[in-house]
Every structure is written in C-alpha cells, then in structure tokens.
C-alpha cells in the first residue's frame, strides 16, 4: 500500500456549506449524488456515527425500494409489498425518496446552510423534471415519496431520540467510567437496544467479552496501546500517526459509516454501475453499517469496559503485574464518551468490507480512499483489498490510543458477521414479477 499526495485535491472534510457550492453534475449518478449530499448533511449537523448510519440507511432503503419498484422489482424490496410500477421513472423515484427523507429528517439544513439546501433542490429538479415523459416523472415522484414515508414511519419509534438516564458507569476495576477532559456520561446507551434493520436482535452476534484482566492477552493489548497510542508517540511511526488521523472521522466529518459510503461510491462510479445496482449497493452497505452500529453498541453496554486512558492510569487495580500504571499517560486522539469494547471502527469497517467483497465478487480490489481529517486532505491511501482497509481502519484506533487489540479483533468479527448476514439475506435477486401500470 502506498501513499500519494495530490496538489490541489478537494478536501472532503470541508464544511458542508463549501461542499454544497459544487456544481450539479450533468451526467446523473442519482443514488451516488444523493449519498454525497447525505454526507454533507452529516458533516453539517455533526451527527454521531450511529446517528449517521441510521440516516444513511433510511435514505438508501427508501431510494432502493423506489428504484426497485420502478424497475420491475428485480430484487427483494426492503419494506414494500406492492406491485412493480411500470410507468414510473426510476431516477425520479430515487431522487424524490432521498429528497423527502432529508427534508423531513433534517429541516434545519435550509437555515444553517442555504447553499447545501440549494444543491439539494437543484439535484431534485435535475432528476424529476427531465429525461422521461411528464407522466412517468410524476409517477416516479409519487412512488419515491411513498417509499420515503414508509421507511420513516417504520423507524419513527426505534428509540433513536429517547433520553435515557445518564449512564455514569462504575468505579469497579475494568468498568467504564467518564474519561477526561469532558468527564461526560456515556453516549447513546439506547442504541444497544435499538431494533435492528436486518438482524434478529442486537445481540445476534454478541462477542465473548474482553479477556480477564489477569491474563496475558489483556496485558499484551494494554501494553500495545500504551506504547503505540500515546500522545507522546515515541514508539509510533509517522505513518501510524497518519493512519490514526486518516481514519479518525471525528465529529463534524462524514463519520466511519460515511467514510465507507464514500469509498463505495468511488468504486461504483468507476465501475459505471446502473441505477438499480447503485441503489442496491448503497442499501446493502448502509443497512450493514446501521446494524454494525447496533451490534457494536450492544456489546459496548453489555460489557461496559473501561477505556485505555482509565485502564492504563488505574492499572494497579487490575492486579496484573505485566502492566505498568501511568496516571500521566494520554492518548493521541480524544477518547470517545462510551465504553471501549468492541471497537466501532472495526465493526463498521469489517461490515463494509464483507458487503463490498461480496457485491464486487471478491475481497481483492485496488482502490483508494481519502480522509475527512482537514490536515490530511491532500493524502490518498491506496489498498489492494477491502479487508486490508478494514484492518487498517480498526488498527487506527490503537494508534490513536482509544482501543485495545482484542476489541479490534472482536469488532472485526462482529462486523464481518453482520455484513455477511445482510448480504446473504436481504436485497436478493428474485424471479420476474408482473408489473403494474399505476403507482401503489
């Protein structure tokens, strides 16, 4: 894997307002273009990774069901039991679905970023006012809006916006408790019990838990993070520092799920996928990412394990003499305010890698990725396989000092299981179905 620097490369981490000023493409990759808009909205609204994964999944399942129905139902719908709609424009259906979801879920975009709102409107008009007869466009708009409303209704009471009591953890050795500097309660405990998009339950692929604190495996992982993840960085190479920052995807960026959406969109554009395949790819990927979030949060709150900054500072309480306590130790990256085990980055990345490998016919593929971290906007990292990128993304959290190696490995296992399950059980090709001439 090499690193190249491209002078003048547009920074994906620029604020949504700036990104929204880009001209609307003449050649319409409708699903990919709308996913780019969703990423801008995620940046603008500073969504957390679980929140971002939910928004991406709502947009993409709505768009997929709309495109699928308008294209003769070649694939299993996600949440639609009607007939195919032969007279509907698939492109208009996709645009109407995406536009309606974003307009309803994020009504504050227009006031906070008028340029982004204008871009959304321009994309909508591009895809709904030409390229097909007026009746077909109207049918597509109606279909897309209906599918958007159906998905939003399906997820309206999934608990995303509940306000549970503050989760402060425990002072027990090994247990999570607030971390400096904010010392805030744990974020989004409700995500651990959210109804999944595809899984039978949040705990379907629950991992075994952290190793015992008196074990060599636990000590080895703590020592690895203590050495490689320190803010001082004496044992960390410059490339590993770059990797930690490259995949950081902190608040105000596209987030880890969005990073993989961006990677997939680049590959899909290069492969010139048709509209149905674009919609299916993004539906597969976004639901896998959404369920990876739920599965990861299930594990995080089932085991409620302490973060490295706590474990290293209070290592004496572990009873493991193979670890040296250091209360002055600080991580390279800010510690996220929720339990450590498992690594969400590893779960998100492995789920994406599993979906992409199956969709494109194998794990090995040469592709590049960019970062939303502002100081790395001119850096492109190249990979030869999806699994290699997932491995690097997960290891980035160890280099950043906020995860342990066992959490990375178990996060990869959970994410891979989620991605395989989604691909094998949803959005499958089906036999030809009789079409209808009217929108449901």
Indicate where each model-derived feature is located.
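Sequence-pattern detector for short linear motifs
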Residues: 8-10, 57
